[in-house]
């Protein structure tokens, strides 16, 4: 990962981005601002609400942005470091299998930006009552999780995906 700076986009024609988002590369920030501007009218986005949603162990970053129909998620995955094709392929397989995954609304493969539906900020663990493992609410959540796992198991994808073997695991680490 790289150092973070607070470079800003001086072009007033760009959307007013939330200054809480930091960019190490001013060119990447400008590309993001231009891409976001193109999505704003189409999806009713409010660029000033862009904020960090989460990050993972890769170069990908995730932002949450408010829109006319609620919040959406933006994935920033620089193409030089991240290939989003496997993500898109798996997302489409899971969605076709009726698994609760974010819907891909827009994908700019060349720039590595993606607009996704937002499943919310809460994880399964955060919704459980840890000191009451058999509580009714917990049971309902566990049942929902099991139903999702069953749907995943019913997806016939062996011929569409590379095997997740030791070599692939090592590349991802």
List where the protein language model places each region:
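Alpha-helical protein-protein interaction elements
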Residues: 15, 24-27, 51-55, 105
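A short N-terminal beta->alpha junction/helix N-cap motif
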Residues: 20-23, 50, 78
